[in-house]
């Protein structure tokens, strides 16, 4: 039995937004399976990383399911916060099921995974000025219209967990 063609998408997903969704759907047109790797999994309840790894996986799965994505094609994994260098790229490659490529627009991530032997594929840009976690979190803090930038299921989960309030509390710490 031939192994499926598989790619890695590595991100913090704080939160999982429409840009992530578009990249995931684009990648599923090219690969049999995707590994969605949640980075900085040990960090939460901060302005940079307000959501837990479990919440981020929940957001991804619900958004993808709502879009009709076959979740048997999606593998989720987590990795704690670590510095970016080729040794950690090898660690990650051995942490997840075998992958053929990494999909990233981050030049530093691209370089270390290239140095570790993976093919690097840059996805198309999907309105990166809008679909950026830092911008979405800023809108949350300012009571702006962040909901139009995330899948409906993600907005519902953020509401359910009190995510905006959590982010505001994290931002108000001295």
UniProtKB/Swiss-Prot annotation:
<dbReference type="InterPro" id="IPR014729">
    <property type="entry name" value="Rossmann-like_a/b/a_fold"/>
</dbReference>
<keyword id="KW-0548">Nucleotidyltransferase</keyword>
<dbReference type="GO" id="GO:0005737">
    <property type="term" value="C:cytoplasm"/>
</dbReference>
<dbReference type="GO" id="GO:0009435">
    <property type="term" value="P:NAD biosynthetic process"/>
</dbReference>
<dbReference type="GO" id="GO:0000309">
    <property type="term" value="F:nicotinamide-nucleotide adenylyltransferase activity"/>
</dbReference>
<keyword id="KW-0808">Transferase</keyword>
<protein>
    <recommendedName>
        <fullName>Uncharacterized protein AF_1488</fullName>
    </recommendedName>
</protein>
<dbReference type="InterPro" id="IPR006418">
    <property type="entry name" value="NMN_Atrans_arc"/>
</dbReference>
<dbReference type="Pfam" id="PF01467">
    <property type="entry name" value="CTP_transf_like"/>
</dbReference>
<dbReference type="InterPro" id="IPR004821">
    <property type="entry name" value="Cyt_trans-like"/>
</dbReference>
<comment type="similarity">
    <text>Belongs to the archaeal NMN adenylyltransferase family.</text>
</comment>
